[in-house]
């Protein structure tokens, strides 16, 4: 991907991310802004694009699909795992498997906001982008519901989360409003 501009790489990588998960969706300006918000360097975009054809890969597969060295793959996947874009976990046989996650529905959004939040401008901006993306996806689903109905019928049941006001040790949870 060396002959692509940074913006073209960003759009291509966002397209790969948008194809992940149970419900792939089209690339939007909002999705591009979210990926731009969390990706630290251009090489991470190249790593994301290595998952274009196969969303879960071993180190050997990633070496082939990305063209990166093992050391570079370790560095990039660790960085992307910290942002919530890659899930890296050993398989039952002990082989490390790297999986590209979607933006939403158990992906970047959930991992990004599962940790302790500071209320920083960066967190607020990202939360606003995710809120906008969810509204766009809602509108997309509503306008194409009949075509998407078979996907919903075959999808596993969604987990339900009941928000708590206190932690297990009795401390109040600070809820940061986006308004």
Each PLM stretch: what is its role?
Residues 81-92:
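A short, conserved structural fragment
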Residues 127-179:
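Long, Pro/Ser/Thr-rich low-complexity/intrinsically disordered regulatory tracts in eukaryotic proteins
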Residues 66-82:
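Short amphipathic alpha-helical interaction segments
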Residues 48-49:
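Hydrophobic residues on short alpha-helical segments
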Residues 53-66:
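Short acidic, hydrophobic short linear motifs in intrinsically disordered regions
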Residues 1-33:
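Long, low-complexity, charged/polar intrinsically disordered regions in eukaryotic proteins
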Residues 37-45:
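Short helix-coil-helix linker/hinge
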Residues 93-138:
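Short, amphipathic alpha-helical interaction segments positioned at domain boundaries
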């Amino acid at each position: 991907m060396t002959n692509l501009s940074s913006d073209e790489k960003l759009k291509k990588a966002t397209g790969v991310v948008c194809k992940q998960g149970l419900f792939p969706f089209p690339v939007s300006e909002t999705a591009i802004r979210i990926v731009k918000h969390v990706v630290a360097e251009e090489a991470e975009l190249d790593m994301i694009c290595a998952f274009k054809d196969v969303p879960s890969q071993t180190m050997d597969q990633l070496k082939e699909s990305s063209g990166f060295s093992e050391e570079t793959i370790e560095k990039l996947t660790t960085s992307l795992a910290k942002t919530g874009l890659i899930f890296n976990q050993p398989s039952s046989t002990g082989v490390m498997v790297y999986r590209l996650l979607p933006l939403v529905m158990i992906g970047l959004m959930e991992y990004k906001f599962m940790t302790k939040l500071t209320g920083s401008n960066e967190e607020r901006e990202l939360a606003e982008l995710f809120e906008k993306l969810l509204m766009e996806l809602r509108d997309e689903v509503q306008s194409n519901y009949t075509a998407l109905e078979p996907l919903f019928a075959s999808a596993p049941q969604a987990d339900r989360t009941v928000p708590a006001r206190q932690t297990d040790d009795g401390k109040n949870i600070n809820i940061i409003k986006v308004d």
